[in-house]
C-alpha cells in the first residue's frame, strides 16, 4: 500500500496576462488549463507557456490554488 499523500496532483493553470488585464476589462475571460504534476519532481509552482484563446497568443500560464 502507498504511504502518505498521492504523488500526482491535479492542478489548474491560469493565464497571467488575462488576470492582469481583467482590471481593465479588455479580455472576455480568463484562460485556464487543467493538468497533473508530480509533487516529488516539481515541488514548486508550475509555469508553462500555453495558448490563450482570449489573448490570441502564447502566454505564461501559472499554477493557482484550488
Swiss-Prot record:
Q: Does the keyword Ribosomal protein apply?
A: yes
Coiled-coil intervals, chain numbering: none
Q: Which InterPro entries match?
A: Ribosomal_bL33 (IPR001705), Ribosomal_bL33_CS (IPR018264), Ribosomal_bL33_sf (IPR038584), Ribosomal_zn-bd (IPR011332)
What is one term from the GO cellular component aspect held by the record?
chloroplast
Pfam families found in the cross-reference section:
Ribosomal_L33
Q: Which domain of life is it from?
A: Eukaryota
Is the keyword Transport in the record? no
Q: Where in the cell is it found?
A: Plastid, Chloroplast
PROSITE patterns recorded for this chain? RIBOSOMAL_L33
User: Per the UniProt entry, what is one GO biological process?
Assistant: translation
**Gene Ontology molecular function, alphabetical:** structural constituent of ribosome
Q: Which keywords label this protein?
A: Chloroplast, Plastid, Ribonucleoprotein, Ribosomal protein
Q: Which PANTHER family match?
A: 50S RIBOSOMAL PROTEIN L33, CHLOROPLASTIC, LARGE RIBOSOMAL SUBUNIT PROTEIN BL33C
| Cross-referenced NCBIfam families | PRK00504.1 (NF001764), PRK00595.1 (NF001860), rpmG_bact (TIGR01023)
What family classification does the UniProt entry report for this protein? Belongs to the bacterial ribosomal protein bL33 family.
Protein name stated in the entry? Large ribosomal subunit protein bL33c
* Native source species: Lepidium virginicum (Virginia pepperweed)
Amino acid at each position: 500500500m502507498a504511504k502518505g499523500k498521492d504523488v500526482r496532483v491535479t492542478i489548474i493553470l491560469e493565464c497571467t496576462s488575462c488576470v492582469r488585464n481583467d482590471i481593465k476589462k479588455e479580455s472576455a475571460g480568463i484562460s485556464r488549463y487543467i493538468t497533473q504534476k508530480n509533487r516529488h519532481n516539481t515541488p514548486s509552482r508550475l509555469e508553462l507557456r500555453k495558448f490563450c484563446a482570449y489573448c490570441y497568443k502564447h502566454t505564461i500560464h501559472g499554477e493557482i490554488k484550488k
